[in-house]
Design a protein with these regions (language model features):
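A conserved hydrophobic position in a structured secondary element of the catalytic/binding core
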Residues: 8, 50-53, 94, 130-131
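Amphipathic alpha-helical segments within well-ordered protein domains
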Residues: 59-63, 103
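Short, well-structured N-terminal submotif of metal-dependent ribonuclease cores
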Residues: 1-51, 65-74
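A generic structural signal for short hydrophobic patches within well-formed alpha-helices
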Residues: 13, 55-58, 135-136, 154
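Helix-adjacent hinge/juxtasegments
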Residues: 67-88
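Residues that scaffold the ATP/ADP-binding catalytic core of kinase and kinase-like folds
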Residues: 15-17, 61, 138-139
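Active-site neighborhoods of divalent-metal-dependent phosphate/nucleic-acid chemistry enzymes
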Residues: 85-137
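Acidic, PIN/NYN-like endoribonuclease modules and their adjacent C-terminal/linker elements
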Residues: 1-7, 25-26, 118-159
Length: 159
């Protein structure tokens, strides 16, 4: 059976990095969040994809909110990509498609940024997995893409 390709956006992995940052500050072992544990336990079913956009959002959070040095962030990121054997997208060209989408529907800035993640998932022909329901709902509403999953739907798919 072939693996299901999943694009992991920032909110799918955010907790992992925040836990690592907090553990580093306290000098303790970090707890693996349930989402990440689920991904680890289901590696035989899924192929994972992430991108520079996820990395940038994670890095922004770790630098701004947790004062983590870039070299530490790079190590966290390298471990994350390696553990899940992910394909890493290091560049992507966006175009006027986002303008057309914002003309069609009202959305918050966060949702618009998540459309950039969705565009990468579309190019990779991967399921877009997000805990951000507005992006899922908006993409369905405008008929942009049909491989859209919440984390709960992903869990059901794994069963």
């Amino acid at each position: 059976m072939s693996k299901i390709k999943l694009y992991l956006d920032t909110n799918m992995v955010h907790d992992l990095f925040v836990n690592q940052a907090n553990a580093l500050k306290k000098g303790i072992e970090h707890n693996k969040p349930k989402k990440f544990t689920f991904l680890l336990e289901n590696q035989e079913k899924f192929e994972f994809v992430t991108s520079f956009l996820t990395k940038a959002e994670i890095a922004r959070e770790l630098v701004s909110a947790h004062n983590i040095r870039p070299d530490i962030i790079e190590q966290f990121w390298t471990d994350f990509v390696s553990i899940l054997k992910q394909k890493y997208i290091d560049k992507f060209e966006f175009d006027e498609q986002i303008v057309e989408i914002v003309y069609k529907t009202k959305m918050k800035l966060r949702t618009m940024v998540n459309f950039f993640h969705l565009f990468i998932a579309i190019r990779e022909q991967a399921y877009f997995v997000s805990g951000d329901k507005p992006i899922i709902n908006k993409a369905k509403e405008i008929g942009l893409y049909d491989k859209l999953l919440t984390y709960i739907e992903l869990q059901k798919l794994a069963d």
